[in-house]
UniProtKB/Swiss-Prot annotation:
It is found in: Membrane. It comes from the Eukaryota. GO terms for molecular function: G protein-coupled receptor activity. One of its GO terms (cellular component) is membrane. Belongs to the nematode receptor-like protein sra family. The chain crosses the membrane at residues 28-48, 108-130, 145-165, 193-213, 246-266, 280-300. GO terms for biological process: sensory perception of chemical stimulus. Keywords: Membrane, Transmembrane, Transmembrane helix. This is Serpentine receptor class alpha-29. It is a multi-pass membrane protein.
Length: 348
């Protein structure tokens, strides 16, 4: 994102910030946030009371939802502050911008929660990868695994922010408090992190897809090779959890990837893009806000789907168990009858 310096906004930037399209973007984002708060409350209830995910997966999803609450609240506060600022200073181009120092805490929370959204996708993938072996050390110590993942999800974004922004110029001016502070060095670092994020998220998605395909093929093989009811049930549960996580990762990567890709493209061709369109389009590029909107919806839907599939599988396994019992009972009867015949023949 391009920063604006000095304090006075150019005519193009002022017109872009006060245009109906910009106001529409603020209203649209705020509407999404309000709806996401409602669905988030339902998703938390669903995760808390419906025990369908393994311990670590469930708590990683809860941490993602809690992070979403913080992110949506931060974005709502930034947008409302911006709308108030634009209305108050609509005719004052030298007061319409925010000084970066006034946005320090909003900026920190915005990027902390946005980067957290990327890291919990990595954690969810690793959680499902380590869960492939039901007898592994990881499956026996899921609480420890969750704590390690959570610490990394918090510390890594802080470290990235420090590296990116520690030498930034906080006396510069920006249109909104979600814009990074201005500095040629930190700007280069910002786009490097942005590009790296796209590559890493794409890699995680491809790996998640391969993991899902592997779990699906293994589940099909178990139908013909494994007759232990408990083993088959646990394998199917693991498959359903992996599928749900893959869908969640796909939605997050789609939202975060596209909205990270656009600023990177704009950065390469910013000389040929007018400032007003630059800021108008970026106003809609709220990837983490969109991903936090879809996350609770997917959690609710996948939970209900897993419950339905579990009930279906339980009925199927019970039916198969009864068929096996009848089959073995008939075999026992035949074997016993044949044994009695042989005994009779020997006596005669």
């Amino acid at each position: 994102m391009e920063n604006l310096n000095p304090a006075c906004a150019s005519e193009d930037v002022k017109n872009a910030l006060t245009s109906p399209i910009m106001m529409l973007s603020h209203g649209f984002i705020l509407m999404i946030i309000v709806v996401s708060f409602i669905t988030t409350a339902l998703a938390v209830q669903t995760l808390w009371y419906k025990n369908v995910f393994p311990f670590c997966t469930k708590n990683l999803l809860l941490s993602a939802i809690v992070n979403g609450i913080f992110h949506q609240s931060t974005v709502a506060e930034i947008r409302l502050k911006t709308v108030y600022h634009l209305i108050r200073y609509s005719n004052a181009p030298c007061s319409i911008l925010f000084q970066s120092s006034d946005c320090f805490y909003d900026n920190f929370l915005y990027y902390q929660t946005a980067l957290f959204s990327s890291f919990y996708c990595v954690s969810l993938f690793l959680d499902r990868l380590f869960s492939l072996n039901p007898r592994s050390f990881y499956n026996s110590h899921q609480t420890l695994g969750f704590i390690v993942f959570l610490i990394l999800q918090i510390i890594c974004p802080i470290a990235i922010q420090f590296w990116t922004f520690h030498d930034s110029d906080y006396t510069s001016y920006v249109p909104m408090c979600n814009y990074p502070p201005a500095s040629s060095v930190s700007g280069t670092k910002f786009y490097f992190i942005n590009d790296s994020r796209i590559i890493i998220m794409g890699t995680i998605f491809m790996c998640s897809l391969f993991l899902y395909i592997h779990n699906k093929s293994r589940e099909k093989r178990m139908i013909f090779n494994v007759y232990n009811t408990d083993s088959r049930y646990k394998s199917y549960e693991n498959f359903l959890a992996t599928r749900a996580v893959c869908i969640i990762i796909f939605s997050q990567i789609t939202c975060l990837g596209i909205t990270s890709f656009v600023p990177s493209i704009f950065n390469q061709f910013r000389q040929s893009i007018s400032p007003d369109w630059f800021h108008l389009i970026l106003a809609f590029m709220a990837g983490a806000t969109y991903s936090n909107f879809f996350l609770p919806l997917i959690v609710i839907y996948e939970t209900q789907l897993i419950i339905a599939h579990r009930h279906k599988l339980i009925k199927k396994l019970k039916s198969q168990k009864e068929e096996f019992s009848d089959h073995f009972a008939s075999l026992d009867f035949v074997w016993e009858r044949e044994a009695n015949k042989k005994k009779t023949q020997l006596v005669q």
